[in-house]
Amino acid sequence: RPGHDEASDDYSLTRVPEEARRSWFSVAVQRFGQVSSFQQFMVGAVLGYGMTFTDALIAITVGSVMLEVVTILLGVAGVREGVSTSVLARWSGFGRKGSAAVGLLVAFSLAGWFGVQNGVFAQGMHDLAGWAPEWAWALLGGALVTAISVHGFTVMAWTAYLTVPAFLLLAGWSVADTLAGHSLHDLLTGPPPGPVLSLAEGTTLVAGAFILGALMTPDMTRFNRRPSDVVKQTLLGVTLGEYAIGLTAVMLGHAARTADVVGIITTSSGLWGTLILTTAILKINDWNLYSSALAAVNSADVLLGRRISRR
């Protein structure tokens, strides 16, 4: 049953049919989950450690606008054509072999980000529960994320429905606890506690931290129903993610006088820190692995002439 096979493989090499498209909210929650990640906390803390709050706000604003332009343009292409980023590259000037090269680059890059996020998870869990080595936590986290990614868009959507609100509530409580006792005026007007970052460096840091996610937007928006959905979810997801998470982390960097926001949250939160790390890794790392698999499928199809399953 070709149609069933394509659906179970999340239409890795073909257009997503209209009946398989989703509501904008379903996709928007996952996009927000990508942006409001621990990675964003880390970027914000680095900005806060090296910039004043005002300069960090400007850097986040400029970087966010750049990301939103790229995200919307590629997202609209994804919803109109209904194919993944790597397949879209075939018809966007790269050609078949060029799209295979793009696919390989993306596959390795996202696999690397998967490893980085999993490493942060393993380190944090080891610090909180030292009875197991880091490699064991990395193996457990990787296996859990892989199981979610293998089952495709539907399971990943439900994962986002559960983990995004949980992450925001838990992280919000932890941040409020950490900032308690600090003067809001001092946090907003005080000098950076560490080596100064220039505005250009801060903007590059903001844009560079999520540019790969922005480039992979068609992998997600091919499930949207109309271009306006892409605009809505981008403005909601990227803007709220960058500002709400980024600026909060800037104040954390000022308050704790360190850029190690992972250490701040996990060491001060105990069990809550464990839950924060777990929800943080689940809601973004499944997409790292998912997009990496889509890119690998396209490269195998072009270079080997074999159509392999995304799973």
Residue ranges and their predicted role:
Residues R1-T54, S198-T203, L215, R222-K232:
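Membrane-interface "cap" regions at the ends of multi-pass membrane proteins
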Residues A20-V29, M66, R96-F108, P193-T203, ...:
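Select transmembrane alpha-helical segments in multipass membrane proteins
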Residues R22-W24, H151-Y161, L212-L240, A256-A259, ...:
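Hydrophobic, small-residue-rich membrane helices and short re-entrant helix-turn-helix hairpins
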Residues S37-Q40, V65-V70, V106-G115, A166-A176, ...:
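Selective recognition of specific alpha-helical transmembrane segments in multi-pass small-molecule
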Residues G48-G50, G75-A77, V120-L128, G142-T163, ...:
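Membrane-water interface regions at transmembrane-helix termini and the short interhelical loops
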Residues T61-F94, A101-S109:
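Juxtamembrane transmembrane-helix boundary signature
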Residues V87-W91, N118-A136, N288-R311:
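Helix-loop-helix connectors at the membrane interface of multi-pass transporters/channels
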Residues A100-A107, L128-H151, P165-W173, S198-L215, ...:
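Transmembrane alpha-helical segments of multi-pass small-molecule transport proteins
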